[in-house]
């Protein structure tokens, strides 16, 4: 999206904070329904990040596939679970939580230090000359459509069959 610098930065910070709050909601809510809705917030924020990066097709696919299908399927399956009542008491920390937090923080610090110490501008991207010509003549959405109908036809159809089988299974569980 072509926005002025301060507005773009504000939207990045706003979406980043929404992403972090949604991720914390997924982890910290004891009710699985609330966690699933927080996951929906996270996926919507990721889709809005794609819009800010001028990748509108990926953003729409993110909304349709993940928020519209996967998150609804998660909520659907959680509603059909017949589990015990959720525990109302909340233990702040256990030993396992401390060890897990320590491992996650150390992985996060090592990832950030790796990102900061990598020379990203020294990478040379090589392409074939006909790929450059093809990218000039056809826009991104048309390229995705061409690749889905030629190169990735079989995996695309297999994924659609897997989703159909999972939907039929969910309907069979709902009928019982």
UniProtKB/Swiss-Prot annotation:
Taxonomic source organism: Spinacia oleracea (Spinach)
Principal place of residence: plastid
Pfam families found in the cross-reference section: Oxidored_q3 (PF00499)
Subunit field text: NDH is composed of at least 16 different subunits, 5 of which are encoded in the nucleus.
Catalytic activity as recorded in UniProt: a plastoquinone + NADH + (n+1) H(+)(in) = a plastoquinol + NAD(+) + n H(+)(out); a plastoquinone + NADPH + (n+1) H(+)(in) = a plastoquinol + NADP(+) + n H(+)(out)
Transmembrane segment boundaries: 10-30, 33-53, 63-83, 105-125, 152-172
Source organism phylogeny: Eukaryota, Viridiplantae, Streptophyta, Embryophyta, Tracheophyta
The name this protein goes by in its record: NAD(P)H-quinone oxidoreductase subunit 6, chloroplastic
Function: NDH shuttles electrons from NAD(P)H:plastoquinone, via FMN and iron-sulfur (Fe-S) centers, to quinones in the photosynthetic chain and possibly in a chloroplast respiratory chain. The immediate electron acceptor for the enzyme in this species is believed to be plastoquinone. Couples the redox reaction to proton translocation, and thus conserves the redox energy in a proton gradient.
Family: Belongs to the complex I subunit 6 family.
Encoding gene (name): ndhG
GO molecular function: NADH dehydrogenase (ubiquinone) activity; quinone binding
Bilayer topology term: Multi-pass membrane protein
Compartmental location: Plastid, Chloroplast thylakoid membrane
Alphabetical keyword list: Chloroplast, Membrane, NAD, NADP, Plastid, Plastoquinone, Quinone, Thylakoid, Translocase, Transmembrane, Transmembrane helix, Transport
């Amino acid at each position: 999206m072509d926005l002025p610098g301060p507005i773009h930065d504000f939207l990045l910070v706003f979406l980043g904070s929404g992403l972090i709050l949604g991720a914390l909601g997924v982890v910290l809510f004891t009710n699985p329904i609330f966690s699933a809705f927080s996951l929906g917030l996270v996926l919507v924020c990721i889709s809005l990040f794609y819009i800010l990066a001028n990748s509108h097709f990926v953003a729409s696919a993110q909304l349709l596939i993940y928020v519209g299908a996967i998150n609804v399927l998660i909520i659907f399956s959680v509603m059909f679970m017949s589990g015990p009542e959720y525990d109302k008491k909340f233990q702040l920390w256990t030993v396992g939580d401390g060890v897990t937090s320590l491992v996650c923080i150390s992985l996060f610090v090592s990832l950030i230090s790796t990102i900061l110490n990598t020379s990203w501008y020294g990478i040379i991207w090589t392409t074939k000359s006909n790929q450059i010509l093809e990218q000039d003549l056809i826009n991104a959405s048309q390229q995705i459509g061409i690749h889905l109908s030629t190169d990735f036809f079989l995996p695309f159809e297999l994924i659609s069959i897997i989703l159909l089988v999972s939907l039929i299974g969910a309907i069979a569980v709902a009928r019982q």
